[in-house]
Curated annotation (Swiss-Prot):
GO terms for biological process: cytochrome complex assembly; photosynthesis. The lineage of its organism: Eukaryota, Viridiplantae, Streptophyta, Zygnematophyceae, Zygnematophycidae. HAMAP family: Cytb6_f_PetN (MF_00395). The 4 large subunits of the cytochrome b6-f complex are cytochrome b6, subunit IV (17 kDa polypeptide, PetD), cytochrome f and the Rieske protein, while the 4 small subunits are PetG, PetL, PetM and PetN. The complex functions as a dimer. The chain crosses the membrane at residues 3-23. The gene is petN. It is a single-pass membrane protein. The keyword Transmembrane helix applies. This is Cytochrome b6-f complex subunit 8. One of its GO terms (cellular component) is chloroplast thylakoid membrane.
Amino acid sequence: MDIVSIGWAALMVVFTFSLSLVVWGRSGL
């Protein structure tokens, strides 16, 4: 596994986490 795949994996994790955080915030959960 090279640094590019690690970077992409980390980016996807952060993006998914922030997206679900926004959805939860708008639902008022």
